[in-house]
Amino acid sequence: NGIALSPDGKWMYLSTANRQIRRYAVNSDGTLGAFTMFTEGVGIGDGQKTDVAGNVYSTSGAGPGIVRITSPEGKLLGTINLPIYGGEPKRQICATNEAFGGTDGKTLFIAGCDSVYTIQLKIAGIVPAHNVNK
């Protein structure tokens, strides 16, 4: 299950084992308000991240291998479908987590069952800050 914050830190998104994303208000003292149902359905349930516009990227977990992109208002904007493996034996497609990176933050790295996929986006994601001791 995944946790992501909105770019302004006012919302926390939590994916649940029953394929829901709940949205909580983050209070000024750091506590959480009551949740509202943000979105639910197939393609939700594992890792999630946000971009600079506040869109939420959620991975499907154990299949089908997709990343759903949902607006801050809860509207499905689109999906990223991972490749389907043909031949025998058939392998399950999954998308378990994702991270934004690259020099401009517009590369989305997606962890699959046995591969890592990358896709270039038009919008930057929230890239985690790194604390490097020199």
What does each model-identified segment do?
Residues P7, M12-R19, V56-A62, T70, ...:
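Conserved beta-strand positions in repeat-built beta-propeller and related beta-rich domains
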Residues A25-G41, S71-K90:
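Blade-edge beta-strand/turn elements of extracellular beta-propeller
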Residues G43-I44, N55, A62-G65, E73-K75, ...:
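Short Gly/Pro-enriched loop/turn and capping motifs at secondary-structure junctions
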Residues R23-A25, R68-I69, T118:
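Conserved blade-register residue in beta-propeller folds
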Residues N1-W11, E40-V56, G86-T107:
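Beta-rich, blade/repeat-based domains predominating
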Residues R19-I21, G33, P64-G65, I93, ...:
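Repetitive beta-architecture junctions, highlighting loop-to-beta-strand starts
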Residues A4-A34:
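Glycine- and Gly-Pro-enriched alpha-helical subdomains that act as flexible
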Residues C94-K134:
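Blade-level signature of beta-propeller repeat domains, shared across WD40, Kelch, NHL, RCC1
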